[in-house]
Amino acid sequence: MKKKALLPLFLGIMIFLAGCDYSTPEKQDGFFFNTFVQPMKHLLQWLGNDVFHNNFGLAIIVLVLFIRLILLPFMLSNYKNSHMMREKMKVAKPEVDGIQEKVKRARTQEEKMAANQELMEVYKKYDMNPMKSMLGCLPILIQMPIIMGLYFVLKDKLVNGLSEHPHFLWFNLTKPDIWITVIAGVLYFIQAVVSSKTMPQEQRQMGYMMMVISPIMIIWISLQASSALGLYWSVSALFLVIQTHFANIYYSKLAKKEVQPFIEKYEREHNPSSKKKGKNTQVVSKKNKK
């Protein structure tokens, strides 16, 4: 799934959030309520009432960390694929650009198919799989129903005890708060900036668009809902900023190390002088041994 497909998805979610209502017992039924809203209600009640003794702010923070740990393997795989793809594309780019020019100049369907087949061979040679980029959307898709379930739990005040113990830090968890909303928006903007650093040049325009759309969407929804959702997003964004920063450092070094054999292979194939140089060094080393 390309990131462009996330825009209509976000619009559909906003329409869905605006249309659903679980505020009365007779409305609390159906697949979505029973699968996502009800479990989130029981989990938040257990954390807030039993584990943290009526501290629902801590309950939401722990809930965020729990969800982030579940998503961590998918996120790490995404970071690794992104860095590997970027480093390998640097090596393969001259060949890829040449084939893409062939595709543009192709006049028949057969010529286009032949050029595309040639492109697939280049991807195979450098062990590149563009389909892996689809996994980048997986954490978002997994998290969406969880966030939507939490949204309805908080919006319709379904958690027992939250109305009696709504305060955390300076804000009321059951009401909108402008400051926690702004914090959530700013942190998601920073997260988008940090993430965009690893994007290939051709994808950065979409990344810049998401930098604007994500914070605006989060601010808009947070202002319509209780500040508990703003707290959820703030903690989640802070976790993502830290996670992305350290993952970029680690996987950037790892990708450069693993791509080095492909660079050496490319130089041998496209720079004959490097082959001669390599042979000469081998001859010199043999003479020195003698």
Curated annotation (Swiss-Prot):
It is a multi-pass membrane protein. GO terms for molecular function: membrane insertase activity. GO terms for cellular component: plasma membrane. GO terms for biological process: protein insertion into membrane; protein transport. It comes from the Bacteria. It is found in: Cell membrane. Residues 1-19 form the signal peptide. It holds the Pfam family 60KD_IMP. A lipid is attached at residue 20 (S-diacylglycerol cysteine). Residues 266-290 are annotated as: Disordered. InterPro entries: YidC/ALB3/OXA1/COX18, YidC/Oxa/ALB_C, YidC/YidC1/YidC2_Firmicutes, YidC_ALB_C. The chain crosses the membrane at residues 56-76, 134-154, 176-196, 211-231, 232-252. Keywords: Cell membrane, Chaperone, Lipoprotein, Membrane, Palmitate, Protein transport, Signal, Transmembrane, Transmembrane helix, Transport. The keyword Mitochondrion does not apply. Residues 280-290 have a biased composition (Polar residues). A lipid is attached at residue 20 (N-palmitoyl cysteine). PANTHER family: CYTOCHROME C OXIDASE ASSEMBLY PROTEIN COX18, MITOCHONDRIAL (PTHR12428:SF65), OXA1 (PTHR12428). Belongs to the OXA1/ALB3/YidC family. Type 2 subfamily. Required for the insertion and/or proper folding and/or complex formation of integral membrane proteins into the membrane. Involved in integration of membrane proteins that insert both dependently and independently of the Sec translocase complex, as well as at least some lipoproteins. This is Membrane protein insertase YidC 2. It comes from Staphylococcus epidermidis (strain ATCC 35984 / DSM 28319 / BCRC 17069 / CCUG 31568 / BM 3577 / RP62A). The lineage of its organism: Bacteria, Bacillati, Bacillota, Bacilli, Bacillales. The gene is yidC2.
